[in-house]
Amino acid sequence: MFESGAILIYLAEKSWKFYDKDQRTVINQWLMGQMAYIGPMLGQHHQFHHYNPGKSEFGEERYFKISEKIYKELDERLSFSKYLAAKNYTIADIATFPWIARHEWHDIGLKNFKNLTRWYEEISKRDSVKKGFAFMDKNEFPPKPY
């Protein structure tokens, strides 16, 4: 099995967790949005802005603007939904969180997005998230919003 979204769906179906049957259409929508839009665009922003600054002004500006738009869209969605796809934590949140966890690399200012910050802080407190951050480095933890 390959592809993170497919793996998350498989594990969720096997465990009966984070993938409520009555919410699957919306969960899949946000999961696919992460896989096709949020992840790739923030990944490009990482390449131009974080790893290779000064190499392409066009790339840096383009992906900064797209990343800022993503933050605004997520913040808007979270203004009327506790989590991205449902009232409960789902695989859509699991897939999206790691990209927002690198907010320090984005230089957008997570704290400027009230609802996205609330979502981020709530997920950061989950024991499984803390354990995941500490997997390779015992001192690693989700960065605080700034």
Spell out what each predicted region is.
Residues 74-85:
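Hydrophobic alpha-helical bundle segments that form small-molecule/ligand-binding pockets
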Residues 41-46, 84-112, 117-123, 130, ...:
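GST superfamily/GST-like fold recognition
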Residues 134-146:
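Terminal-tail/helix-coil boundary detector
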Residues 1-69, 75:
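GST-like domain detector, emphasizing the conserved glutathione-binding G-site
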Residues 7, 27, 74, 93, ...:
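Residue-level signal for nonpolar/aromatic packing positions in well-ordered secondary structure
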